[in-house]
Regions:
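N-terminal regions immediately upstream of nucleotidyltransferase
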Residues: 1-89, 100-111, 129
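Generic preference for well-ordered alpha-helical elements
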Residues: 35, 52-59, 63, 91, ...
């Protein structure tokens, strides 16, 4: 699997979504300001090529340190560093593949990570290691010297993470608006206290899926298609993860899919449509998201982790959506709204 990030985006997408601003000139101006702020925020926070190259160098050094004990292994970058949603502050997630078969994450993965931990104890660039026992155990590694600002989370044989990274990379590159929208939604969720897996709220990956689902099913017309349905061979679960390549361009879209590109909706319209969709149209008690199926599914049909009370999660969407359209103290509300989204600072 190549580790080069696809930077070319398709400038194609959907028309106006369900969030309809007031028709006044003042409301339209506010929408323009918000779109510009979102673009600036993404530009300032987006992971740079230089940062990615440093992560690639660190990955290579770790591979050369680990490969003597696992000669046939592969070491893959996964997560936000590669899928297009990385920021300047993103950690480096790595997946060590030692076999094509699944392993027991509760026992075998811990044994492998313990071996890696012992091997890296004498490595000159390693400052600290911590083995974290979870559903998918990880070895957290901190460094000194050149890579002191990068933290690595290493897992073993979590092939799902490689497949998800491959899929998310193509979604993030399909339309230029996807990345800035995801970035500002993550920051908004963090400011509202609902982007912290340690507190049983949304993980960053869950928020990415929520944005993609909205762009597939909530925006009218849709901004994103169902890529797994459109390109079943490319995203087949049977594909060998070692052959996945995030730099290959898409084949022409099959005419049978009937997909049409539109580029009418602004970032602000899509953001407010996202808030409106989860505030008023998505039932957190009954609905779940399926990116693979490209639709909402019954929540009872899928396993769900315990999360914050649904009314607390829903309240953040409702409050943010209503605040933007409040007619009282428009200038103050606009500034507060942008601040809570994370696109301005006091």
């Amino acid at each position: 699997m190549t580790v080069a990030v696809r930077r070319q985006s398709r400038h194609c997408s959907a028309g106006s979504n369900s969030a309809q601003p007031n028709n006044s000139h003042e409301a339209i101006s506010r929408m323009d300001v918000l779109s510009e702020r979102i673009r600036d925020f993404h530009y300032n926070e987006d992971q740079t090529h230089a940062q990615l190259n440093r992560k690639l160098q660190l990955r290579d050094q770790l591979y050369y340190a680990i490969s003597p004990i696992f000669p046939m292994c592969g070491l893959y970058i996964v997560g936000s560093s590669l899928n297009g949603f990385g920021t300047k502050r993103s950690d480096l997630d790595l997946c060590l593949m030692i076999t094509n078969r699944d392993i027991d994450q509760r026992t075998d993965a811990v044994v492998v990570l313990s071996s890696v931990m012992r091997t890296l104890e004498s490595n000159q660039i390693v400052a600290e290691q911590n083995l974290i026992l979870a559903k998918v155990p990880i070895l957290r590694i901190k460094f000194i010297g050149t890579f002191h600002d990068i933290t690595v989370d290493l897992n073993v044989n979590n092939s799902v993470a490689i497949r998800n990274t491959h899929l998310m990379c193509y979604y993030s590159s399909f339309d230029w608006r996807v990345r800035p929208l995801v970035m500002v939604v993550k920051e908004w969720a963090k400011r509202h206290g609902i982007n912290d897996s340690a507190c049983s709220s949304f993980t960053s990956y869950s928020l990415v899926l929520m944005v993609i689902h909205y762009l597939q099913c909530g925006a009218q017309p849709p901004v994103l298609p169902n890529l797994q349905q459109m390109y079943p061979k490319r995203f087949s679960v049977r594909a060998d993860v070692r052959t996945l390549n995030v730099s290959l361009p898409f084949e022409p879209i099959p005419t049978a899919m009937g997909w049409q590109f539109k580029d009418d909706a602004t970032l602000s319209e899509l953001l407010l449509g996202f808030l409106r969709y989860y505030a008023f149209q998505f039932d957190f008690d009954a609905d779940a998201i399926s990116i693979r199926m490209g639709k909402k599914v019954n929540r009872a049909q899928v396993a769900q982790n315990q999360s914050l009370p649904f009314q607390d999660i829903k309240k953040a969407f409702v409050d943010s959506y209503r605040e933007f359209f409040s007619q009282e103290a428009i200038t103050k509300n606009e500034f507060n709204f942008l601040y809570k989204l994370g696109v301005v600072n006091y």
